[in-house]
């Protein structure tokens, strides 16, 4: 009987230590993700470049018609990414994973007709790229989102 009780106590101690280590490791990862996530939050990111399979698509904010200069923006709060397409406002839930992975769910947007089309990027493509984003980084004050096109080409969106 003593051996059974001793065995149960030892098992409980091992399980407790293992779960405490797991909780501690998870807390460290959450703190790291929270710190990295803070780089995203509180800033209105404006799209300045789009690269598909490493090739510059020549999208430039400064050459857009003045009527649509405020387009293709990105704002992160704790749980929702939102912004302006061209011309529609959009939002979507998102999650940040380990190693700067990101998952942006289905984008929902208003349904206004566009009077002016941005050069070299359609709103539909922008929403597709946002929705297909899989990783991110902030480098030299610029946000880079890595994504895929509808036909699975690599996309890099650069925001300032």
Placement of each model-derived feature along the sequence:
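Sec-dependent N-terminal signal peptides
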Residues: 4-13
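Lipid interaction determinants
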Residues: 17-160
């Amino acid at each position: 009987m003593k051996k059974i009780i001793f065995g149960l106590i030892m098992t409980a101690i091992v399980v407790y230590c293992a779960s405490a280590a797991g909780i501690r490791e998870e807390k460290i990862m959450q703190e790291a993700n929270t710190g990295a996530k803070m780089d995203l939050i509180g800033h209105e990111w404006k799209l300045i470049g789009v690269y598909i399979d490493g090739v510059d698509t020549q999208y430039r904010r400064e050459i857009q018609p003045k009527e649509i200069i405020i387009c293709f923006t990105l704002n992160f709060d704790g749980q929702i990414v939102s912004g302006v397409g061209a011309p529609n406002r959009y939002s979507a839930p998102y999650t940040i994973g380990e190693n700067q992975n990101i998952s942006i769910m289905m984008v929902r947007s208003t349904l206004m007709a566009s009077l002016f089309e941005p050069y070299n990027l359609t709103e539909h493509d922008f929403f597709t790229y946002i929705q297909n984003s899989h990783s991110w980084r902030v480098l030299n004050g610029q946000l880079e989102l890595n994504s895929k096109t509808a036909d699975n080409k690599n996309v890099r969106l650069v925001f300032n």
